[in-house]
Amino acid sequence: MAVTINFESDTATGQTWNRPNPNGNNPPTSLSGFATATQYTSQQFFVDTSGLYNFFSKSISPDSWDNYTYLYQNSFNPTTPLANLLIGNDDFSNTTGQSGFNNVSLTAGTQYFFVNTGFTNNDFGTFTSSITGSGNITLGNVADVPEPVSILGTLIGTIYGVGLSRKYKHLKKTTKV
């Protein structure tokens, strides 16, 4: 059963970068010569199941601004836009205003960044995106999710603390008599 997560954002208030050039290679190997100050947003996410995932983004407003999407693994730094870049796409299914890629192999527990930007410096606006795959997709930083051992340690500490508190209250009652 496929799992899908949807989110909406806006590049109009985003920072700018020199986006990678599509040049037919994936991952792209050069920077654009004309999209040198393009606004972007980056959405961190991770998956809990390794497998193939699909990505789709559609521009909303202004109508059909020409969006472009990229996928990064481990980290994303707009000052080094070719580092950690896995794939980029413009005009998904040859449709301006839609971008994405299918059957991208992701690894469970790895941090990824889905970047939405414009094709040119004048392309920006709101968009909706979706990520679909076989596992749960969590928006955010993988480092913010506690490890099971941490959860167990917290639970044991809480139980121990409650036990000590009850013992202290019991001792307090018996010493008053």
Segments the model singles out, each with a brief description of its role:
Residues Q98-V104:
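Exposed aromatic-hydrophobic patches
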Residues I60-D66, N122-D123:
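Extended, low-complexity, turn-rich repeat/linker tracts enriched in Gly/Pro/Ser/Thr and Asp/Glu
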Residues Y53-I60:
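Short amphipathic, basic-aromatic surface patches that mediate peripheral association
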Residues V162-V177:
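C-terminal membrane-anchoring or membrane-association module
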Residues L82-Q98:
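Extracytoplasmic beta-sandwich strand-turn segments characteristic of Greek-key/jelly-roll folds
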Residues G51-Y53, W65-N67:
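Short beta-strand/loop motifs in extracellular/secreted proteins, especially
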Residues V3-P28, S32-D48, L71-L85, V104-A143:
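C-terminal edge strands of extracellular/lumenal beta-sandwich accessory domains
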Residues P146-R166:
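A short, hydrophobic C-terminal helix/tail in secreted or cell-surface proteins
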